Amino acid sequence: MIVRTLEEIEDTDADIKTENWRSKRIVLAREKVGFSVHETTLYAGTVNDFWYANHIEAVFVFEGEGEITDKATGETHQLKPGSLYLLNNHDKHQVRPKTDMRTVCVFNPPVTGREVHDENGVYPVIVEDEEEAAS
């Protein structure tokens, strides 16, 4: 059994900070459970273009408000506490938080925590090697 708190993750290598968002990686690929879980805060007034070409992501909003636009169709959905969006088709999307928006994100395949969005907003697939995963 693994039990973690957000406080344990803060200011570690599992706490990723950018100008637009902060993501605390709670469960990562090294746990070998087939998914990763993150608590991510997207900052008010930012514009965030993402495309998870190599991952499926589910995002549950539990605080704040914003909107998401499907970049292929132009369809926009309002996001508020209790909203969930599932990027089941590797959808290119844009998230625009109106207020700081706190979310819980689940990725499959799991991320390692070392991924960086490329110029298209894509995370590469990084596979944990056995030795690294054991540490």
From Swiss-Prot:
Pathway(s) of this molecule: Amine and polyamine biosynthesis; ectoine biosynthesis; L-ectoine from L-aspartate 4-semialdehyde: step 3/3
Gene3D superfamilies from the UniProt entry: Jelly Rolls (2.60.120.10)
Superkingdom, natural source: Bacteria
Signal peptide (residue range): none
Keyword Phosphoprotein: no
EC number(s) from the headed UniProt entry: 4.2.1.108
Reactions catalysed: (2S)-4-acetamido-2-aminobutanoate = L-ectoine + H2O
One MF annotation (Gene Ontology) recorded for this entry: ectoine synthase activity
Any one of the GO BP annotations: ectoine biosynthetic process
Swiss-Prot/TrEMBL keywords: Lyase
Protein task: Catalyzes the circularization of gamma-N-acetyl-alpha,gamma-diaminobutyric acid (ADABA) to ectoine (1,4,5,6-tetrahydro-2-methyl-4-pyrimidine carboxylic acid), which is an excellent osmoprotectant.
Family membership noted in the UniProt record: Belongs to the ectoine synthase family.
Protein name: L-ectoine synthase
Classification of source organism: Bacteria, Bacillati, Actinomycetota, Actinomycetes, Pseudonocardiales
Gene designation: ectC
